[in-house]
Amino acid sequence: MARKTPIARYRNIGICAHVDAGKTTTTERVLFYTGLSHKIGEVHDGAATMDWMEQEQERGITITSAATTCFWAGMEQQFDQHRINIIDTPGHVDFTIEVERSLRVLDGAVVVLCGSSGVQPQTETVWRQANKYEVPRMVFVNKMDRAGANFLRVVEQLKDRLGATAVPLQMTIGSEDEFKGIVDLIEMKAILWNEADQGMTFDRADIPADMLEECEELREQMVEAAAEANEELMEKYLEEGELTNDEIKKGIRLRTLANEIVPVLGGSAFKNKGVQAMLDAVIEYLPAPTEVKAIQGTLEDGETVAERHADDTEPFSALAFKIATDPFVGTLTFFRVYSGKLESGTALLNSVKGKKERIGRMVQMHANSREEIKEVLAGDIAAAIGLKDTTTGDTLCAENSFIVLERMEFPEPVISVAVEPKSKADQEKMGIALGKLAQEDPSFRVRTDEETGQTIISGMGELHLDILVDRMRREFKVEANIGKPQVAYRERITKTSEIEGKFVRQSGGRGQFGHVWIRFEPAEDGDAEGLEFVNEIVGGVVPKEYIPAVEKGISEQMQNGVVAGYPLLGLKATIYDGSYHDVDSNEMAFKIAASMATKKLAQHGGAVLLEPMMKVEVVTPEENMGDVVGDLNRRRGLIQGMDENPSGKVVNAEVPLAEMFGYATALRSATQGRATFTMEFERYAEAPSNIAEEIIAKNKTGE
């Protein structure tokens, strides 16, 4: 089958934003203008096409990133038809993992900001993640019709808070109720969209006289930014003081792709203004798959690094970036094709798991409807139905051309709760449901507590777990009770100690004998999970076949902790002496001896309890400021700064997670629902002694 759209006309983009910046509405409008969606879905009515899970529609926030394909040839049909694959990403901080996954497979991103609240804490998180994956991006300042909206203030925030070289390509005409349209600074014309046909048509007009001077100044800055793209443009600009419109576009494109500048556009998706021009900018300034760095991976030896280019003739390689369970077809595995092509019915290799997968049916998604396809080519994003062993982050490649593409890193969960099925019938269903949810979401973990036999689920925040329990009820019809949230405490030693571990058992016949001296010290990276183990034994005082057992004894004891039963972080252990018995020594005896030595860290290692500290940002009306700060102080919070934005005062604080349970409800009642907050994991810090004693005592009595 021949390629319908040349790869140079593909755009794989993500639309990222803070919770209320209006990202879903923006995506909806994109689908409307590109002709796929006939009635515009409003999030206010809970009917947006992209938000396809019931909870998303109720809560009005996007949880799963659905991938959608649409086509666009420009507001005035001035381009050849381009294929735009949009990955919708969630904006809530509990779902940062989804954003990270999406950014991994995108080539470019549109960051949507709210014209009045501007750069929010979640924006900073998304921005950092986009920097990590070097994703070229542009900004769409949405909600220009909102009270307090100010386009140029948001441009300043981009520079100050995110350190971005923001270059406006437009200026908004009016704001709040007076928002009329935008000025295109390249053409120096006003664009006014027609409200009667929901913005499908528009007029170009002269720039309002009172804005002319400001627009000329902004244009000058934009032309300067474009001229810095290369020497040729710079020379022309210095000689003539001007560039042609095509040269400006070329310069801005080059610098956007190089991640040197961030073009900024404005509009109001809700009022059908500006999204059409934003789509044009996606085509003009964001990269095709062939214009980003070729993806790298490792070959079968696990060391040699190879590249795969966006080319249909190269061997097939793809990355699975999302698993979703669909009530009608079962498991959908979303994947991005980096190189080569694939027909349905072909067998592939999952190189991470080392297992074969047969691709039966493939579909391409439009928000919540799907089209079955027979073939995918380089640059495509599609979903395969019924893969058995593939999970998020796995590589799929041609059987004869092994490669493992760069893996994704997933954060450790910070909050756990016990779940208990309400009836015997729910018990079995709950196991299946939790298994499926964990397969879809790598930041969600399920385990059974060995001592209590309870099922414990862990995730990135209260909202994250609420939604998963909610999905269990709706999608899998499992009724469950939720226990009190448990905090993921950790332990760490603070001083160096040399400890003897000796395990001797004589009981007639063959005995047991293991004897070690171990130096324990805090590792350089105090938050490192896992053990840094050094063997300094000389002269075989402990035979080398027992050394792995010593390491295992220490690391198993690390998992169970030494003070209160929580895993130890940042431990370095060096075995430097010991002794053995020709007959009685064995691996088990040395493992127990090492474990006994590790347990003694409670007395000798200055072991302390660590608690997760959260970075909390509260936006509150001024009159509630005192209550909010007082409440955070009561929760052992450390106020780190105060700021203000149009939506009110902003309080930044670091607060222990243990004190943040139920905070959403408390904040709502203290401020009549006018304040909002976001919270994300910051670091582990030593718990105050009174708190630590309480937790240790609780764990000893086994409450």
From Swiss-Prot:
CDD domains: EF-G, EFG_III, EFG_mtEFG1_IV, EFG_mtEFG_C, EFG_mtEFG_II. GO terms for biological process: ribosome disassembly. InterPro entries: EFG_II, EFG_III, EFG_III/V, EFG_IV, EFG_V, EFG_V-like, EFTu-like_2, G_TR_CS. Keywords: Cytoplasm, Elongation factor, GTP-binding, Nucleotide-binding, Protein biosynthesis. SUPFAM superfamilies: EF-G C-terminal domain-like, P-loop containing nucleoside triphosphate hydrolases, Ribosomal protein S5 domain 2-like, Translation proteins. GTP binds at residues 17-24, 88-92, 142-145. It is found in: Cytoplasm. GO terms for cellular component: cytoplasm. Residues 8-290 form the tr-type G domain. It comes from the Bacteria. Its main location: cytoplasm. GO terms for molecular function: GTP binding; GTPase activity; guanosine tetraphosphate binding; translation elongation factor activity. Belongs to the TRAFAC class translation factor GTPase superfamily. Classic translation factor GTPase family. EF-G/EF-2 subfamily. Catalyzes the GTP-dependent ribosomal translocation step during translation elongation. During this step, the ribosome changes from the pre-translocational (PRE) to the post-translocational (POST) state as the newly formed A-site-bound peptidyl-tRNA and P-site-bound deacylated tRNA move to the P and E sites, respectively. Catalyzes the coordinated movement of the two tRNA molecules, the mRNA and conformational changes in the ribosome. HAMAP family: EF_G_EF_2_B. This is Elongation factor G. It comes from Teredinibacter turnerae (strain ATCC 39867 / T7901).
